[in-house]
């Protein structure tokens, strides 16, 4: 779909599409868990292989996910998206104006304004491709197409609310685990639930199977995000490159953070607060201190939460009447991987 879009919008006529081309690596580097859940779920519920129409419709989840990543990196001012430069930071390098370093009003400089502005436009293009994936899927009943578009809209509303909570957390010195889970379920979890709903809608599944698959997705998402946050803080072995300390420097409010604030002794908590979230002023010593406190007072608890959510996810999976047990095996393996994946 991206190739078709870019072919229809050559750089000679649409110069700003060069940034979309420039970020092609980011567009193709994802794990595609959401797409896998939707397609495998459909095949398991129907006992039939996913045809081209189903496969295309399910790609809306990955297009939408990319849309959120482009915007998330702007809001968090992240210069890297795991092993790649973030879209806005990549785009900023294209700015050749003599005023590149001149301070901006909203953005730090004219260069960063250019990069972020182009990334916002690219995000909107990618968001439109999510809708086009559903609209152009062949062989779908009109009612099914309408329900999928409705699911996308609902994801928009709930996920943006979760992102808003995440931004509000930046000003909170302490958050509770329950507050964190509400945010995570709305932000990360809602798109995974959308993947389960997509599978169920395409397969015309029963309400009980739909509910069980959505429950699987919800618990899977919580475990997935917790593992992501362990990797993003570098408290476990990871293969995500330089961004393994990014969450610490940026002061991300994760479950790790919530538990460390709650369970660390007063002296360790005070040192943690001083060293956490210092942005460009973060030093290797700050990062090392934060990691030590996270390992001593939060890591075991987060791993226990991951295991608990994986048990709940697998229990929900057992309740689904799949017609093809290869789906159960695949989703079980994806779930268990959240306890040990390195990237």
Language-model features: locations:
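All-alpha prenyltransferase/terpene-synthase fold signal
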Residues: 1-343
């Amino acid at each position: 779909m991206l190739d078709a879009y870019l072919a229809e919008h050559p750089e000679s006529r649409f110069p700003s599409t060069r940034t979309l081309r420039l970020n092609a690596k980011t567009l193709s580097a994802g794990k595609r868990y959401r797409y896998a859940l939707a397609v495998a779920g459909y095949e398991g519920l129907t006992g039939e292989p996913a045809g081209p129409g189903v496969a295309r419709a399910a790609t809306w989840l990955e297009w939408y996910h990319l849309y959120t990543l482009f915007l998330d990196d702007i809001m968090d001012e992240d210069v890297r998206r795991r092993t790649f430069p973030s879209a806005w930071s990549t785009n900023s390098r294209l700015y050749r104006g003599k005023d590149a370093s001149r301070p901006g009003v909203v953005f730090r400089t004219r260069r960063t304004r250019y990069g972020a502005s182009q990334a916002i436009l690219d995000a909107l293009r990618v968001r439109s491709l999510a809708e086009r994936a559903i609209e152009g899927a062949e062989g779908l009943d009109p009612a099914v197409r309408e329900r999928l578009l409705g699911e996308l809209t609902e994801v928009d509303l709930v996920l943006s609310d979760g992102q808003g909570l995440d931004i509000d957390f930046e000003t909170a010195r302490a958050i509770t685990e329950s507050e964190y889970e509400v945010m995570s379920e709305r932000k990360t979890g809602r798109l995974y639930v959308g993947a389960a709903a997509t599978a169920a809608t395409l397969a015309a599944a029963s309400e009980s199977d739909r509910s069980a698959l959505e429950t699987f997705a919800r618990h899977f998402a919580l475990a997935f995000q917790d593992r992501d946050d362990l990797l993003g803080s570098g408290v476990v072995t990871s293969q995500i490159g330089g961004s393994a300390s990014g969450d610490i420097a940026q002061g991300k409010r994760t479950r790790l953070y919530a538990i460390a604030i709650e369970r660390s002794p007063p002296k360790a908590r005070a040192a943690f607060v001083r060293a956490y979230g210092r942005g460009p002023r973060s030093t290797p010593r700050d990062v090392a201190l934060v990691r030590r406190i996270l390992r001593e007072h939060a890591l075991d608890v987060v791993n226990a939460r991951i295991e608990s959510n994986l048990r709940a996810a697998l229990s929900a999976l057992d309740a689904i009447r799949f017609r093809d047990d290869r789906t159960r095996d695949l989703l079980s393996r994806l779930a268990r991987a959240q306890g040990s994946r390195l990237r």
